[in-house]
Amino acid sequence: MDVRFPIGKLQVPEKVTIEDIHEWLKQIETYTNRLGETVNSLNDEELSKTYREGSWDIRQLVHHIADSQLNMYQRLKLALTDESPTVPAFDQEKWAIQPDTNLPVETSIKMLEGINERIVSLGYRLTEEQLDQSFVHQINGEISVASKVAKLAWHEEHHLAHIKIALSNNSGS
């Protein structure tokens, strides 16, 4: 297994259906509870564990998940409200070292709870036509609403797997 992609790379079907969207939304809907069950009782030493040498530690991963969902949610909303808006990339490495990432992981879990609730509420009301609406990412190009919902689900699961790998490692890194 490649620990960088423990659940594999994101794969989006060529033709995404409303059923696909609903499956991804079910994952997003339960994610905050599953993440909380995994990290809420961890001490500082455990939160400092990494899944591979040079990777973010568990604390940074939890904050990154919230930061990313926030950015992706905003992009999703822009794709639904504007005509092919261009969105900037965000420098996740710089976000990961900002002072707010020293807060307890519970702050990001609370943030995720609200963002994911909004994503799920919006997602269950998407129409077939809306799945093809898109935004233009300044680096990655055109991204459809359907692909963004897939990534919203995949990205969280991807990092939950990283956290579980870090916890199974015996060393601090």
UniProtKB/Swiss-Prot annotation:
Q: What are the required cofactors?
A: Zn(2+)
Q: What is its EC number?
A: 3.-.-.-
Q: What does the UniProt record say this protein does?
A: Possible metal-dependent hydrolase.
Q: Which GO terms describe its cellular component?
A: cytoplasm
Which organism is this protein's natural source?
A: Oceanobacillus iheyensis (strain DSM 14371 / CIP 107618 / JCM 11309 / KCTC 3954 / HTE831)
Entry note: cofactor: Binds 1 zinc ion per subunit.
Q: What is this protein called?
A: Putative metal-dependent hydrolase OB0413
The record's annotation in SUPFAM superfamilies points to: DinB/YfiT-like putative metalloenzymes
Q: Which family does it belong to?
A: Belongs to the metal hydrolase YfiT family.
Subunit description: Homodimer.
Give the source's domain of life in one word.
Bacteria
Give residues annotated as binding Zn(2+).
64, 155, 159
Q: Name one GO molecular function term.
A: zinc ion binding
Pfam families annotated for this entry? DinB_2 (PF12867)
HAMAP family for the chain: YfiT_hydrol
* Alphabetical UniProt keywords: Cytoplasm, Hydrolase, Metal-binding, Zinc
Give its localization.
Cytoplasm
Grouped into one coarse class, the protein's main location is: cytoplasm
